[in-house]
Amino acid sequence: MNEHISSLLNEDCVRHIMCFLTDKEKGKFCLTCRDLLYLIKDVKFNDPVNKDNIEHLSYKKNFNCTYKISTVQDTNNRPISCFKIDFPNNKPTIIQKVVLPTNQTGNTFTFRLDENAFEKLLEHEDKVHKAITLIEQSITENESKKYPRLSLIQKY
């Protein structure tokens, strides 16, 4: 008896099951059966993922949160790792946790926040200030004023 999951459950059931899985489990689940592999193009992934790791994927638009790490020099020629998080369609999302790779020792993180989130952050600045020495709002000419970029520089 060699039945595939697609013969036991219809597509709607499989999609509903995926709502309860982690991003890693969603990918593994789709790879369990050739009949499920086509579903991976419809799966939405929520965990932050490095943009460089998904550029080759045909379904890279399905990742709700991507980040890019780049290194720049500060005024004393010390390297600073910039961690920039992007959201699709400029739709800001609340970030609950950010885990940096262990090889990143820099101290600059750039987040894109909407105005309400920025105001909320400033309300709690006393709590945030323990980990942050500088909050700098900068808007580049290509970005909308509605979604300013916020740089958080963490102290050592």
From Swiss-Prot:
Recorded superkingdom: Viruses
- One short Pfam name that applies is F-box
Name the InterPro entries on file. Answer: F-box_dom (IPR001810)
Q: Which residues form the F-box domain?
A: 4-51
The name of this protein is Putative F-box protein R637
